[in-house]
Amino acid sequence: MLDLKFIREHPGTVKHAIAVKGVNLDLDELLRIDRELVELRQRVEALQTERNANAKLVPKATPEERPHLIQKGKDLAEDIKALEPQLRAHEDQLRQLLLRVPNIPHPSVPVGQDDSENVELRREGQLPEFAFPPLDHVELLERQGWSDPERVARVSGSRSYLLKGDAVLLEMAVLMFALDFLRGRGLTPLSTTALVRPETLVGSGHFPGGEDQVYKIEGDELMLAGTAEVPVNSLYAGEQLSYEELPLAFAAISAAFRSEAGSAGRDVRGLIRVHEFRKVEQYVMTRADEAEALRWFGAILENAEGLLRALELPYRVVQNCTGDMGAGKVLMYDIETWVPSEGKYRETHSCSYLGDWQARRTGLRYRDEHGKLVYAHTLNNTGIATPRILVPLLENHQQADGTIRVPEALRPYLGGREVLGVPVRAAAAEAKSPRNK
């Protein structure tokens, strides 16, 4: 949510953000309701002032004047009461429209309609060169007996998954490694629930507009969040922190749930797009200093890149265009990791800076060095998400016999093992393990 004063003073800037982000919002309607609300409040305040002045006259009035003044006070009270429904309706309308106002993108953000217009910034790591026909992650899991897609589909339907044996240990190793890695970078580990109240999804910016992506608990006012960003963003809702308490930086682990509405037919097979997953999320609350916030943006981006380098996975960083960055984002970079079976990079991380857009929604403020109450700034980035990260991990580290080479960083979490699985296919005499170009 943007400052209403800023919207009034910079309607052209806000309209441009609405246009380039593809937001369905009539800013002129918002400004009209705002003007009408100002007028209504002025009328109510004028009536209240008149009523208060009238009330002061009653004790001093003569017996002849008093009945008239008392009646006038009642009439003024009725006039005020008659305006209250209009006042509340305008306040509600304005609030709902303000929640849809997008943030202003950073000047560096490219203008575009969708992810096809994102801009690649850099590539890291060398793509694997296999001396054998590589398998995709589904085949690798099935040949090792690490999955059971048919049975789990009968239990949970499409976009569900089940891991067995060493695949479970690998998933847990990745999550624990990510937590340890981020803790070493100064983030506080946090384990949080995925169950949240609807207002937390408003606070994070997922509502209004993303309702079809969220699972609801019938018979209860609770929903299942798709990221730990949602509950962590509301942990300090309505609070006033001190200058010294910020920044707060968390590595939050939780289950995550997404309905994947609008994804029919996309990534149905395998682990790329599932309804339930586990995720370690980086989340930062910092002071209202854009330079400081952008330093944090660089830090949590580097954290994610450091994790991928430690997992020995090739990746690229792209800057999201205006049409692919979400309403609340000032700046957003995606990290995409190489998936050999698809011959392309797939998104595994999203790094975002939101200014005070979320803090205004939750009421998170702090006292600056001058004692003034100001809204905090927030940032977030994926630490690691499973099982999606297992896709590039399995495929990039597969060996000719179908076993998986364990990256050195994960070996302490797997009892020192260097290889997972057993040989499940004959390797050609000349075949070698993946080697780097």
Curated annotation (Swiss-Prot):
Q: Which UniProt keywords apply?
A: Aminoacyl-tRNA synthetase, ATP-binding, Cytoplasm, Ligase, Nucleotide-binding, Protein biosynthesis
GO biological process terms, semicolon-separated: selenocysteine biosynthetic process; seryl-tRNA aminoacylation
What CDD domains does the annotation carry?
Answer: SerRS_core (cd00770)
Q: Which PROSITE patterns match?
A: AA_TRNA_LIGASE_II (PS50862)
Does the keyword Acetylation belong to this entry? no
Protein localization: Cytoplasm
Please write the reaction equations for the catalytic activity of this protein. Answer: tRNA(Ser) + L-serine + ATP = L-seryl-tRNA(Ser) + AMP + diphosphate + H(+); tRNA(Sec) + L-serine + ATP = L-seryl-tRNA(Sec) + AMP + diphosphate + H(+)
Q: Which residues bind L-serine?
A: T227, A228, E229, E281, T382
State which Enzyme Commission number(s) the record gives. 6.1.1.11
* Gene Ontology terms, MF aspect: ATP binding; serine-tRNA ligase activity
Please state the pathway this protein functions in, per its UniProt record. Aminoacyl-tRNA biosynthesis; selenocysteinyl-tRNA(Sec) biosynthesis; L-seryl-tRNA(Sec) from L-serine and tRNA(Sec): step 1/1
Query: Where do the annotations place ATP binding?
Result: R258, S259, E260, V274, E347, T348, H349, S350
Q: Could you give one GO CC term from the UniProt record?
A: cytoplasm
Principal subcellular localisation of the protein:
cytoplasm
Keyword Ion transport in annotation: no
What InterPro entries does this protein map onto? Answer: aa-tRNA-synt_IIb (IPR002314), aa-tRNA-synth_II (IPR006195), aa-tRNA-synth_II/BPL/LPL (IPR045864), Ser-tRNA-ligase_type_1 (IPR002317), Ser-tRNA-synth_1_N (IPR015866), SerRS_1_N_sf (IPR042103), SerRS_core (IPR033729), tRNA-bd_arm (IPR010978)
**Subunit note:** Homodimer. The tRNA molecule binds across the dimer.
Q: What is this protein's function?
A: Catalyzes the attachment of serine to tRNA(Ser). Is also able to aminoacylate tRNA(Sec) with serine, to form the misacylated tRNA L-seryl-tRNA(Sec), which will be further converted into selenocysteinyl-tRNA(Sec).
Q: State the domain notes.
A: Consists of two distinct domains, a catalytic core and a N-terminal extension that is involved in tRNA binding.
**Family membership:** Belongs to the class-II aminoacyl-tRNA synthetase family. Type-1 seryl-tRNA synthetase subfamily.
Instruction: Supply the name of the protein.
Output: Serine--tRNA ligase
Give the organism the record lists.
Deinococcus geothermalis (strain DSM 11300 / CIP 105573 / AG-3a)
